[in-house]
Amino acid sequence: NRPREYDGSHIHFVGMNPEISLREHQRNAIAHVLYGGNTLLAHEVGAGKTFEMAASAMEAKRLGLCQKSLFVVPNHLTEQWAAEFLHLYPNAKLLVARKKDFETANRKKFCARIATGDYDAVIIGHSQFERIPLSYERQERIIQEQIDETLAAIEELKANAGENFSIKQMEKTRKTLETKLEKLRSDARKDDVITFEQLGVDRLFVDESHFYKNLFLTTKMRNVAGLSTSEAQKSSDMFGKCRYLDEITGGRGVVFATGTPVSNS
C-alpha cells in the first residue's frame, strides 16, 4: 500500500507575503498537514520547515480546522521563529514567550493570555512547554495505565516462565511508576496553575522534535537498541499532551518537525 501523496498546488495562501513563493515540496507538505492528520515533517535542514509550519497554522485557522496553534521550539529560537513567521505573514497575530514570562510570578498570567487571547499562533520554548502541566487527573490516569500495563506484562512473563532478569526489570519499572504516582499525589500542584487543557490549544507544532525521545515503553524485550524502558520526563509530558490533542481532534492536531528523525538513544 503506497502512502497517500498530497498535492498543495491548489492552495491559495491568504495573507501571505506576496514576495515569497513556496516551493512545491513545501506546498505539498502543507496539504499533508491540512488534510492528512498528525504529520511528521522530516526534511533536511534548509528545506523550509519553518514556513511550512507557519503556513499550515494560518491556513488551518482560516479554513476552520483549528482555533489556536501552539509552536514549541528550541529555547534560543523563539524570537527567530517569530521573525520568520511575521516575514511570511506580516499581519499574523502572535504571542511570543520571553524568558521572564515563565518565572513563577508571571507564568499564570502568561498562560491566562494564551487561554483568553485570539492568537494565530503562540510560540514558546521547549523548557517552557514542560512548565505548563497537564491536569492532575490526566497525569494520574496516564501513570495508572502504565502501571496496569507493567503488571499485566509481569503476569504474562510469570505464566510463561519468563527470564528472572526480565521480571526483575519489570518489577523495578513498576516500583518507579508507583513512586512517580505517589509524588504526583503529594505534590498535586498546589500553586493553582492553568493546565494545558485550559489553554484552548487545538493544534501543536513541535520543532526539533527529536529532542523528545526515550519515551517509556512496556516491553518484555531487553537490550534492544532504541527501545527505552527508562524515561525522559519531558518525553512523557509531550506524549500525554499529544494524547490529549488526539482525543479532541481525532488524531489531527499534532505536527512534529525534525531534520534528524531516527537516531539510537
Task: Give the location of each predicted region.
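Interdomain "pre-motor" coupling segment immediately N-terminal to P-loop NTPase/helicase cores
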Residues: 1-4
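SF2 helicase/translocase NTPase motor core
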Residues: 8-21, 49-56, 61-242, 246, ...
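Generic enzyme active-site microenvironment
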Residues: 41-42, 205
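N-terminal pre-P-loop "Q-motif" helix
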Residues: 18-37
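Pre-Walker A (Motif I) flank of P-loop NTPase domains
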Residues: 35-41, 67-68, 120, 251-254
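Histidine-centered active-site/metal-ligand motif
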Residues: 25, 43, 210
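P-loop (Walker A) phosphate-binding loop of NTP-binding proteins
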Residues: 44, 74, 260
